[in-house]
Amino acid sequence: MSAALLRRGLELLGAPEAPGAAPGHTKPSQAPMKRTRKAKATQAQKLRNSAKGKVPKSALAEFRKKERRGYLGVNLRFMTSARSTVDESVTRQIMRQNRGRKACDRPVTKTKKKKKAEGTVFTEEDFQKFQREYFGS
């Protein structure tokens, strides 16, 4: 069990710390420095194993250099050089068949609402009768 785990367990249980350890004064871990030292040593070993006077190229760096290269021109040349050998009438027929199939190609048909004839349910006689009853004339 590591010292850090043991310390955490003791903190959780609330047991008193060891008498020699001062609170908050822990020695910084040597792991990051050790890791960088080890990485430098392995890199130096790799350089030593190469041919005399030659520096080995990083495969990742080479890939990144080539990755930046644009393939637009190459692709355009390829597309323009490979001409279609299909007859134009066949392509027109295919285009005509495909044109109406998708929903986005179909025009939206708007249904116009029929206007109802604005008329009244009451007749002229009913209005006159109402007027006489309401206004008293």
Curated annotation (Swiss-Prot):
Chief localization: nucleus
Modified residues (Phosphoserine): S84
Cellular compartments per GO CC: cytosol; nucleolus; nucleoplasm; small-subunit processome
Regions of compositional bias (Low complexity) in chain numbering: 14-24
Localization (cell): Nucleus, Nucleolus
Post-translational modification note: Citrullinated by PADI4.
Positions bearing Citrulline: R7
Pfam family, one: AROS
Thylakoid in keyword set: no
GO MF terms held by the record: enzyme binding
GO biological process: ribosomal small subunit biogenesis
Region Disordered: start-end pairs: 14-58, 96-120
Entry keyword set: Citrullination, Nucleus, Phosphoprotein
Domain of life assignment: Eukaryota
Phosphoprotein keyword on record: yes
Family: Belongs to the AROS family.
PANTHER family xref list: ACTIVE REGULATOR OF SIRT1
Subunit structure, interactors included: Part of the small subunit (SSU) processome, composed of more than 70 proteins and the RNA chaperone small nucleolar RNA (snoRNA) U3. Interacts with RPS19; the interaction is direct and mediates the integration of RPS19 in state post-A1. Interacts with SIRT1.
Function text: Part of the small subunit (SSU) processome, first precursor of the small eukaryotic ribosomal subunit. During the assembly of the SSU processome in the nucleolus, many ribosome biogenesis factors, an RNA chaperone and ribosomal proteins associate with the nascent pre-rRNA and work in concert to generate RNA folding, modifications, rearrangements and cleavage as well as targeted degradation of pre-ribosomal RNA by the RNA exosome. Acts as a chaperone that specifically mediates the integration of RPS19 in state post-A1. Direct regulator of SIRT1.
Protein's name according to its UniProt entry: Active regulator of SIRT1
Upper lineage: Eukaryota, Metazoa, Chordata, Craniata, Vertebrata
